[in-house]
């Protein structure tokens, strides 16, 4: 998708937000009235449009060739194209990435986030994956994590310095999530667990765009009930995070390889092995306790899953819309790539 092929139009979006949805009523609510006005959406969409047109769209060609490469090793196993680094930094500096996942004071209306994501996924479906999953991780931590966990992880997830993932699927546990075999063993430190297991098809599971990746991983503690009732959720960083927020040693999270998904070869969909050297640790999300073998990990993970389902639907709609733009221009140009 070359720069000249950026065909996106913003008129429909502005009509929907301003004239059809009546967002002015939403902005009168206490959560937004002291932070945003209708004019703000104009400036936000304008900046996002220019970033998509001038930075993301030209880099999309690299998403297919050369795409992301698996090079192996413990700490830096996946390499993305150089153009991705510029895109990632530009989006983070413009606060057009995971910052929208923040749901605390001063949060942005999610109906503003949808058109932002719509433009970005039209410009490059691969690249946008790197911060969409981070946004979901922020949502889960804000809703369920302890204050200490929020203070430790959310700030750098919001800035994109760290990435986030949804560690759900395993080789033998896809739709049947309750069959997860990953294990979490308590340590002498309350809330801290030693983890083992393999996760597959993990979107943005490893890459070189962020200095650390925070995996939200489903696992079962000893004596947990069978099925989804026994599942708990854990914060498992690629590099350990010290109490002061600094990075510690590699946390025994090994990238085994990446998939080549149709249409998003630049996206790093990874297979991850936790605890191969028996040195992988994580924190149970929140003040949760496993009582009578029951965990609340699935409840927590559904906040993540439901958000990503909406994002996936938006991706599909976006690609359909962008293709319709391409076809409408085809009689006048044969340079659409």
What are these regions (language model features)?
Residues 129-147, 174:
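N-terminal glycine-rich flavin-associated loop
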Residues 20-30, 84-93, 110-113, 192-195, ...:
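Active-site-adjacent bridging/hinge elements
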């Amino acid at each position: 998708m070359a720069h000249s092929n950026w065909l996106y139009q913003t008129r429909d979006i502005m009509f929907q937000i301003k004239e059809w949805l009546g967002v002015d009523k939403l902005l009168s609510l206490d959560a937004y009235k002291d932070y945003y006005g209708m004019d703000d959406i104009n400036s936000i969409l304008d900046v996002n449009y220019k970033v998509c047109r001038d930075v993301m769209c030209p880099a999309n060609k690299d998403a297919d060739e050369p795409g992301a490469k698996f090079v192996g090793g413990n700490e830096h196993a996946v390499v993305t194209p150089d153009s991705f680094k510029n895109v990632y930094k530009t989006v983070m500096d413009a606060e057009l990435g995971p910052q929208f996942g923040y749901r605390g004071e001063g949060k942005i209306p999610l109906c503003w986030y949808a058109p932002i994501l719509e433009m970005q996924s039209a410009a490059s479906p691969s690249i946008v994956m790197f911060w969409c999953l981070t946004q979901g991780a922020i949502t889960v931590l804000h809703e369920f994590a302890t204050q200490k966990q929020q203070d430790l992880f959310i700030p750098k997830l919001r800035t994109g310095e760290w990435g986030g993932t949804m560690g759900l699927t395993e080789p033998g546990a896809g739709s049947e999530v309750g069959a997860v075999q990953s294990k979490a063993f308590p340590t002498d430190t309350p809330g801290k667990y030693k983890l083992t297991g393999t996760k597959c098809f993990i979107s943005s599971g490893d890459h070189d765009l962020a200095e650390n990746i925070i995996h939200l991983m489903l696992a079962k503690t000893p004596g947990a009930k069978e099925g989804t009732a026994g599942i708990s959720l854990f914060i498992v960083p690629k590099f350990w995070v010290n109490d002061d927020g600094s990075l510690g040693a590699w946390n025994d999270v090994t990238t085994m390889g990446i998939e080549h998904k149709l249409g998003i070869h630049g996206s790093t969909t990874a297979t991850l092995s936790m605890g191969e050297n028996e040195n992988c640790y994580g924190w149970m999300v929140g003040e949760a306790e496993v009582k009578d073998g029951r965990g609340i990990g699935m409840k927590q993970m559904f906040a993540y899953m439901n958000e990503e389902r909406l994002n996936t639907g938006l991706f599909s709609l976006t690609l359909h819309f962008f293709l319709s733009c391409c076809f409408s221009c085809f009689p006048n140009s044969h340079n659409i790539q």
